[in-house]
Amino acid sequence: MSEKHPGPLVVEGKLSDAERMKLESNYLRGTIAEDLNDGLTGGFKGDNFLLIRFHGMYQQDDRDIRAERAAQKLEPRHAMLLRCRLPGGVITTTQWQAIDKFAADNTIYGSIRLTNRQTFQFHGILKKNVKPVHQMLHSVGLDALATANDMNRNVLCTSNPYESQLHAEAYEWAKKISEHLLPRTRAYAEIWLDQEKVATTDEEPILGQTYLPRKFKTTVVIPPQNDIDLHANDMNFVAIAENGKLVGFNLLVGGGLSIEHGNKKTYARTASEFGYLPLEHTLAVAEAVVTTQRDWGNRTDRKNAKTKYTLERVGLETFKAEVERRAGIKFEPIRPYEFTGRGDRIGWVKGIDNNWHLTLFIENGRILDYPGRPLKTGLLEIAKIHQGEFRITANQNLIIASVPESQKVKIETLARDHGLMNAVSAQRENSMACVSFPTCPLAMAEAERFLPSFTDKVEAILEKHGIPDEHIVMRVTGCPNGCGRAMLAEIGLVGKAPGRYNLHLGGNRIGTRIPRMYKENITESDILASLDELVGRWAKEREAGEGFGDFTVRAGIIRPVLDPARDFWE
């Protein structure tokens, strides 16, 4: 151990089994191709169960019928989740029509699920349809490479519809970063696209033969919007503009929200400021952060392997100096920036290019034809006539982007006729959940299926206390992995067991503070009783413009989390 940093640069010890699996996989091939032809099981076996994640898929089963199938001596109804790589969430209407058709024809649930990482997922793909889905994506210029497991995941970019030039520049950087950090293995093309094996040996100059120690998430952020929740991510490029033109980025590193119940070595953490860099150094810096985490991240304990833990172990200054050394630059001081919100502006917004952008609220991102609200059909009909593109937001909503004045009435009519523009409360617009049951194998409590009716009850509490137009950033996540980003909410519910949640309070509206656990393992009625009391106090005692989370801290209801590595569990 050096005196310059608090812990070892590399954690010695027995490597986790995931490291063996990656090393023996022949650059992510495993025996996936052979397993595809095994009709005796609907799932993937052995290492392939985990290796398919590098190809953008998770093996799941329908937990609603798991016990019933076990009683019938049947294996679980295995089906895959597939997540598309879609940097910045931009998708053409031609691509949308293709994914709409695949969801209808080849998935169990028939839905498209928008995620809070600006992409879409298919749930319920049977094994026989796994290869066809990759080929369908490829046919319209998409893929699912590196959207799961130990790689740089889908790169997010602020869905800012009115600063069109700045958004266009930031979006281009999101795409460049995504491409630069992609794996170089030909396994994806060989297995799914039937491309010929070539004699040359695979090399992974950035990710290495065993890839990253853990998942890695990257964003490009355009202040004052923090819609992409930068503090949930390992590496964040905050856009700095002069006269409406992008000149460089502030770099923030080491955010992340996943924890393990009761494991005090795990904690949610906000990202740390490293400094400012001019545009021309962006890719070199991105690569340097990733390779530093590749070499220094903990490969013995996956629960402690993310960048946030590496940063705490070696020290921020040591990590930053190594990034500077590898990138060949010195960071300049952080340039001023501030965030004012992170919700989407639902409805029409006019961009500075005179095009219009229509943001549609999609509850929990689930696109399906509901009774009386055929959302999926409505979006398909819009896709057939819209000349621009769609943009998926990090709040699981959808923007019909770049609509000329002449098309505005036609598109709004389609949206209204299909229930896509039904009025909802500010509270509902600011509530979000992960998928959880019935498909997620990690789910401990309901989330997506729980949130709509729970939001009804929170709306009733706001109404009761005379503030029906107010909102509280509220999120539900079905397990402590935290996909619903509850650890950056003003009210965060984290699933503990069926019908039971940990209640976290004290985050803020702009997503820069981690909430602390207020009550543990409580029922919905307990949560509502607490919220009734606290919202009542907020309505009476708040200062002008004070959000619920800031109020709970100022009023002494909850202590703020100031240094998560040391005080998250206190």
Swiss-Prot record:
Q: Any idea of its EC number?
A: 1.8.1.2
InterPro entries associated with the record: CysI, NiRdtase/SiRdtase_haem-b_fer, Nit/Sulf_reduc_fer-like_dom_sf, NO2/SO3_Rdtase_4Fe4S_dom, NO2/SO3_Rdtase_4Fe4S_prot, NO2/SO3_Rdtase_4Fe4S_sf, NO2/SO3_Rdtase_FeS/sirohaem_BS
User: What does the note under cofactor report?
Assistant: Binds 1 siroheme per subunit.
Q: Name one GO cellular component term.
A: sulfite reductase complex (NADPH)
The organism's superkingdom is given as Bacteria
Q: Which residues cross the membrane?
A: none
Recorded hits in Gene3D superfamilies, A to Z, give: Sulfite Reductase Hemoprotein, domain 1
Q: Which reaction does it catalyse?
A: hydrogen sulfide + 3 NADP(+) + 3 H2O = sulfite + 3 NADPH + 4 H(+)
Which BP terms does GO give this entry?
Answer: cysteine biosynthetic process; hydrogen sulfide biosynthetic process; sulfate assimilation
- Asked if the record carries the keyword Zinc-finger, the reply is no
Question: So which residues are the signal peptide here?
Answer: none
Task: Supply the PROSITE patterns for this chain.
Answer: NIR_SIR
Establish whether keyword Nucleotidyltransferase is in the entry: no
Known pathway = Sulfur metabolism; hydrogen sulfide biosynthesis; hydrogen sulfide from sulfite (NADPH route): step 1/1
Q: Name the UniProt key words of this record, in alphabetical order.
A: 4Fe-4S, Amino-acid biosynthesis, Cysteine biosynthesis, Heme, Iron, Iron-sulfur, Metal-binding, NADP, Oxidoreductase
Please tell me where [4Fe-4S] cluster binds in this chain. Answer: 434, 440, 479, 483
> Which Gene Ontology terms cover its molecular function?
4 iron, 4 sulfur cluster binding; heme binding; metal ion binding; NADP binding; sulfite reductase (ferredoxin) activity; sulfite reductase (NADPH) activity
Where on this chain does siroheme bind?
Answer: 483
Known cofactor(s): siroheme; [4Fe-4S] cluster
Concerning its family, UniProt says: Belongs to the nitrite and sulfite reductase 4Fe-4S domain family.
Q: Which purpose does this protein serve, as stated in its record?
A: Component of the sulfite reductase complex that catalyzes the 6-electron reduction of sulfite to sulfide. This is one of several activities required for the biosynthesis of L-cysteine from sulfate.
Its assembly, as annotated, is: Alpha(8)-beta(8). The alpha component is a flavoprotein, the beta component is a hemoprotein.
Matching NCBIfam families: CysI, PRK13504.1
Protein name from the UniProt record: Sulfite reductase [NADPH] hemoprotein beta-component
According to its UniProt entry, this protein's organism is: Salmonella schwarzengrund (strain CVM19633)
The upper taxonomy is: Bacteria, Pseudomonadati, Pseudomonadota, Gammaproteobacteria, Enterobacterales
